[in-house]
């Protein structure tokens, strides 16, 4: 689940960052897109548990929208909590 959550966050980070960059600097779009892609690949292999502060710091360095990232993180955390509760409830029903 953590890998899926991390992948979704980084994919959203990449998409939101790229959409912002396209408006600001269309000349360097491919370069920044590749840097974002590399960031996602590197970070995805390095992080096992998400530290939102480190993620926001790195996103700021790359010029991504941190408000969107924070909202996505909170939503994924909420969904993960609901699934944990659901799994716990289901296991309690089993004999």
UniProtKB/Swiss-Prot annotation:
Signal peptide range: 1-21
Record's keyword terms, sorted: Signal
Name this polypeptide is given: Uncharacterized protein AF_2354
Organism: Archaeoglobus fulgidus (strain ATCC 49558 / DSM 4304 / JCM 9628 / NBRC 100126 / VC-16)
Lineage, top ranks: Archaea, Methanobacteriati, Methanobacteriota, Archaeoglobi, Archaeoglobales
């Amino acid at each position: 689940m953590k890998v899926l959550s991390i992948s979704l966050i980084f994919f959203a980070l990449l998409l939101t960052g790229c959409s912002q960059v396209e408006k600001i600097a269309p000349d360097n779009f491919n370069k920044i897109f590749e840097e974002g892609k590399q960031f996602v690949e590197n970070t995805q292999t390095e992080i096992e548990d998400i530290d939102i502060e480190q993620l926001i710091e790195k996103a700021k360095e790359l010029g991504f929208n941190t408000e969107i990232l924070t909202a996505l993180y909170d939503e994924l955390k909420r969904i993960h909590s609901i699934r944990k509760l659901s799994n716990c409830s289901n296991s309690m029903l089993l004999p």
